[in-house]
Amino acid sequence: MLRDGNEGMSTIPGFSQIQFEGFCRFVDQGLAEELHKFPKIEDTDQEIEFQLLVETYQLAEPLIKERDAVYESLTHSSELYVPAGLIWKVGRDMQEQTVFIGNIPLMNSLGTFIVNGIYRIVINQILQSPGIYYSSELDHNGISVYTGTIISDRGGRSELEIDRKARIWARVSRKQKISILVLPSAMGSNLREILDNVCYPEILLYFPNEKEKKKIGSKENAILEFYQQFSCVGGDPVFSESLCKELQKRFFQQRCELGRIGRQNMNQRLNIDIPQNNTFLLPRDVLAATDHLIGMKFGMGTLDDMNHLKNKRIRSVADLLQDQFGLALVRLENVVRGTICGAIRHKFIPTPQNLVTSTPLTTTYESFFGLHPLSQVLDRTNPLTQIVHGRKSSYLGPGGLTGRTASFRIRDIHPSHYGRICPIDTSEGINVGLIGSLAIHARIGDWGSIRSPFYEISERSKEEQMVYLSPRRDEYYMVMVAAGNSLALNQDIQDEQVVPARYRQEFVTIAWEHIDLRSIYPLQYFSIGASLIPFIEHNDANRALMSSNMQRQAVPLSRSEKCIVGTGLERQAALDSGGSAIAQHEGKVIYTDTEKILLSGNGDTISIPLLMYQRSNKNTCMHQKPQVHRDKYVKKGQVLADGAATVGGELALGKNVLVAHMPWEGYNFEDAVLISERLVYGDIYTSFHIRKYEIQTHVTSHGPEKITNEIPHLEAHLLRNLDRNGIVMLGSWVETGDVLVGKLTPQTAKESSYAPEDRLLRVILGIQVSTAKETCLKLPIGGRGRVIDVRWIQKKGASSYNPEKIRVYISQKREIKVGDKVAGRHGNKGIISKILPRQDMPYLQDGTPVDMVFNPLGVPSRMNVGQIFECSLGLAGDLLDRHYRITPFDERYEQEASRKLVFPELYEASKRTANPWVFEPEYPGKSRIFDGRTGDPFEQPVIIGKSYMLKLIHQVDDKIHGRSSGHYALVTQQPLRGRAKQGGQRVGEMEVWALEGFGVAHILQEMLTYKSDHIRARQELLGTTIVGGTIPKPEGAPESFRLLVRELRSLALELKHFLVSEKNFQINRKEA
């Protein structure tokens, strides 16, 4: 049944909407909730009372713009003002003032914060939802032991368990447990109330003897028993108020506060009706949980699946910011209380503004954004990375799991993830399955549940209405999995169809008439990264995972190109990333240049600033290029300027290049890639990178450091690019070792420390010898480029605690070279092994040389056949000048649907271009190509086509490293590890075997002695190199062997070793 007009259509929600909605919820609700919790503060004599009048709090507009905050390394925040009152109880006078509480960082439209000039984002955390969960385990006798676990809002856990004798226990610690009757008795219930509120009183009465009944005879006795077992205290403790407070703080506050989410879950699971505002665990909850536990023992009720999303909750940015705001108010309360007491003691008349300071709130948020694991620096490698980063969900973090303790069951895909968490997109390594990505249509509800949209099918009218369902609700509906099956042409076919569906976490096949809900979009259950992979249904899930991760590592190219074969989400991803400049109003373009666009509309002139060579935190270049001309009319929503990695408002991460899948002289062995020099000289894969170099000027004990261009310690050619202030000039080309900022640090020098020539100059000519030390900012190795920006950040009152900063930004142009990493969109990655002249590359039958050559063995074993479909369809699209947007899972319409789509396009391209080699019926998709060196055809036809290939951030310029000299580890005396420490390359056991296999004894000896941990041989080598002569051969044991001997001695094992002389092979005993 076809629909008229736009009926039944839906739009994809903004990809940054989840973050932005969470922050708005914090501003609208969270601030007010925490402010209402702020108590009234009195002095010790109860003469003065301070309170916040929270009904009319205000958030002021930011004092600086986002760009200025980034430029000046400031925080883009809003000032919070709250009316406060100070009441004098003696005269009943009230002084009211508006006080400044502090600064709250603001979220921008992209869902990010700017803190100290750095873009940061807060990740959503998945936690176990508070409530009660029933499970069973087998004991050592093979008998099921049923357990009810109560999880509090703070993550604390208490367990109720029933043993094989039907005795019920409350476990208060890992080793201690008490009778279930003690817990409600300690909460204030007597035995009669307990027995009246349970369904199985005879089971509870069966358990206690006379001694046990005495323990629950009163509340005091129950508290003493509870405290004795909980704290493992012996003897006979005495009941007191301090004992109750300690128990309240250590147990009840940590494990019995359910929160509003926990109260709702507890009411639903136990079928009770306790009011929502009662968020603490009550005796009624414990007794109802006991009844359900007894029912489980006798086969009534169902166990809970802890990994089901209905038992999880999202801790969003709103919750995290609200928790930090509450923590800041607690600190503010302590400050106000101390200030009031001090003012009264010193007979000082306080005012509300004198009592309140902004330090607690400001420092709390600064530490949160700087130190909290869920607050991360925004990854801005390309536009896709920015929006994907904000949609991540993590099981890690405070109150969550760790990568080393999480089980496989938690990491695994669960049926409840359907339409909520992507089954493909997750991290690789130790955190696999713990860090996921939300599906493109997923939303986060007010109660922390992840909701997914479905079309609800009415029985009467067969009309569809979109609803957002939580995991708890859609469990009992028949949900049709494949959305495309609903596109049947008439009602008769619809009635006869048998469709796949999901019901109660199981996948079944059922008639159409029994369907309650259906999916709204074929890509509904995928994340953004996975939704950008064409023909994803033909790829192995592991390769799709790699692809979704590698697309986030793609470097924006200098000349971007949108893909020939895509999925249709490229425009939405580019739009929501904020990389492109979009017209907010319709109007006429009256001026445009590289810095701004002036738009005239409705009598107003709007200036739209553009990004110019802005550095991302991954050193990639963020730049916007105008796409409209002067005197042109634009509409609202039209693209005014393309950003990095966008073309025409669509995401463009790579280039469409001509590829061939064939071996070539071993240069594409094991995922190596052979490329043509056209990709280098044509700037096909050329990218710009911007590096930041920073230096600070301090005020030392001998005086302030000085920025100058007069550096007597350095040669003149190193200072050639400095201006009169000692800072490198804009537009200068700098090489390794050049001085970017000249700086002298004062220091004291004694007369005896002067060199003889310095003393001579002072005595004869009277010249004052400089006592300053050269501490210039120099360009490190691999940093050559063009200076594009210099920033001198001067703050008021410069001191040793508030130094001035000078930042120099240098742009580098990087062509693709051997060692760079490239990848496709199907997990097909490789390293450039050789760059061939274009005349030596294999060429097609029309003479066109191939751009890249891949190993054909990388396809069948990895099972990512989607790259073959994309390759062939891309060739047809290039010849026909078409772009394709392919919806995944097209096999639901008919078998071999993808193949039936590609082959007709190749056939049409062959006919239109009069090139029969494009589609040859004997081997469709393949073609015979020729060797560029000899002109001879290869033996077998080869798959050729246009693939969309990306250049990744893993570039050889950032990774290549060589060590001539450097530091050694103190214990092993071996070179340090890592490029940043000027470390060496480890020669392990297998590397030694390889060198032994080639018989290179002298090279092996050098690696294991001179270049490693033979201290004496290293010293002799240095002296011999300076003086000249024959390098002596190492004698004695290396330091690592001596270390082994010492460690064995520490275990009371004496190990003696012997050295064999080369001359007579006699054994000489020598001590280590």
Swiss-Prot record:
Keywords of the record: Chloroplast, DNA-directed RNA polymerase, Nucleotidyltransferase, Plastid, Transcription, Transferase
GO biological process, alphabetically ordered: DNA-templated transcription
Broad enzyme group: transferase
E.C. no: 2.7.7.6
Subunit structure: In plastids the minimal PEP RNA polymerase catalytic core is composed of four subunits: alpha, beta, beta', and beta''. When a (nuclear-encoded) sigma factor is associated with the core the holoenzyme is formed, which can initiate transcription.
Function: DNA-dependent RNA polymerase catalyzes the transcription of DNA into RNA using the four ribonucleoside triphosphates as substrates.
Protein name: DNA-directed RNA polymerase subunit beta
Species the sequence originates in: Amborella trichopoda
